[in-house]
C-alpha cells in the first residue's frame, strides 16, 4: 500500500491521498497518509521540496506534507495511482518537514 494513491471515502476538502506508511509496520486499522491538493491551488513559489508536485492522469497535484495524518482504513477508497517511482521525493519531503534535511 505504501506510495499508492487512494480516493478518500469521507467528505473532505481533499479527494485523494498517498499512503506513506511502511508496509512492514502494523498499526491495526490505521494508515499514515498525505493528502493531495490540486496544484492550481498553490503558488509556484511554494516549496516543491516540501510540497512535491505529482501527476495523476492529466492532472497535477501537490502533496500536502504538513497535513500528514493517520486515517482509519475504512476511509481508504479506490487505488488510483502508484507513486513508487517518486519514493525519494516523498521521503525527502517528510525528512524536510521533521528534521529540516
UniProtKB/Swiss-Prot annotation:
Listed under GO biological process in this entry are: plasmid maintenance
Which keywords has UniProt assigned to this entry?
A: Plasmid, Repressor, Toxin-antitoxin system, Transcription, Transcription regulation
Gene Ontology terms, MF aspect: DNA topoisomerase type II (double strand cut, ATP-hydrolyzing) inhibitor activity
Q: Which Gene3D superfamilies match?
A: 2.30.30.110
**InterPro entries in UniProt:** CcdB, Plasmid_toxin/cell-grow_inhib
Pfam family name, one? CcdB
Q: What's the stated role of this polypeptide?
A: Toxic component of a type II toxin-antitoxin (TA) system, functioning in plasmid maintainence. Responsible for the post-segregational killing (PSK) of plasmid-free cells, also referred to as a plasmid addiction system. Half-life of over 2 hours. Interferes with the activity of DNA gyrase, inducing it to form a covalent GyrA-DNA complex that cannot be resolved, thus promoting breakage of plasmid and chromosomal DNA.
The similarity comment for this entry is: Belongs to the CcdB toxin family.
Tell me the protein's name.
Toxin CcdB
List the lineage, top down: Bacteria, Pseudomonadati, Pseudomonadota, Gammaproteobacteria, Enterobacterales
Amino acid at each position: 500500500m505504501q506510495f499508492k494513491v487512494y480516493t478518500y471515502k469521507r467528505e473532505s476538502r481533499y479527494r485523494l491521498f498517498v499512503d506513506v506508511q511502511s508496509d512492514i509496520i502494523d498499526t491495526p486499522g490505521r494508515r499514515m497518509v498525505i493528502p493531495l491538493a490540486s496544484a492550481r491551488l498553490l503558488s509556484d513559489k511554494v516549496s516543491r521540496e516540501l510540497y512535491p508536485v505529482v501527476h495523476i492522469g492529466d492532472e497535477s497535484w501537490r502533496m500536502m506534507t504538513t497535513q500528514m495524518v493517520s486515517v482509519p482504513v475504512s476511509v481508504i477508497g479506490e487505488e488510483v495511482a502508484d507513486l513508487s517511482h517518486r519514493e525519494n521525493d516523498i521521503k525527502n519531503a517528510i525528512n524536510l518537514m521533521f528534521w529540516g534535511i
